[in-house]
Amino acid sequence: ASSAASDVYKRQEVWRYAKNEKLTMKQLLNEDYQGIRPAVGYPSLPDISVSFLLDKLIDMKRIGIHLTENGMMQPHASVCGLMFAHPASRYFSVGKIDEEQLMDYASRRKIDADVLRKYLAANLQP
């Protein structure tokens, strides 16, 4: 409950969105609020290498978090993701991608496709 209350405060007072949203504790716990928070490694953001980009952006070691060579966060309870405030934002699943999609993604990320294969193995079509 304390964490949920803190979340509401940040969303309304710091990030300045959903200012008039009034939710019950049950709605908060069910995540019935405006926006989404896809976490790295989950279905809508399966590429764990994104963790390395976020580390460069926010310098995780300043708060005692480091990444393993595979992108796993330590301590284990750590999590990182993206915040989208738009009221129409919805979770989705990336699903399986083919070789052409992998090559396009690798090109746009400027990363070798073989490196991305490691991070997206579960999402690659056979």
What positions do the PLM features span?
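Small-residue-enriched alpha-helical segments and adjacent helix-cap loops
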Residues: 11-89, 100, 119
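Single conserved hydrophobic/aromatic residue that forms the stacking wall/gate
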Residues: 1-9
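Charged substrate- and nucleic-acid-binding regions of tRNA-handling and nucleotidyl-transfer enzymes
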Residues: 79, 83-126
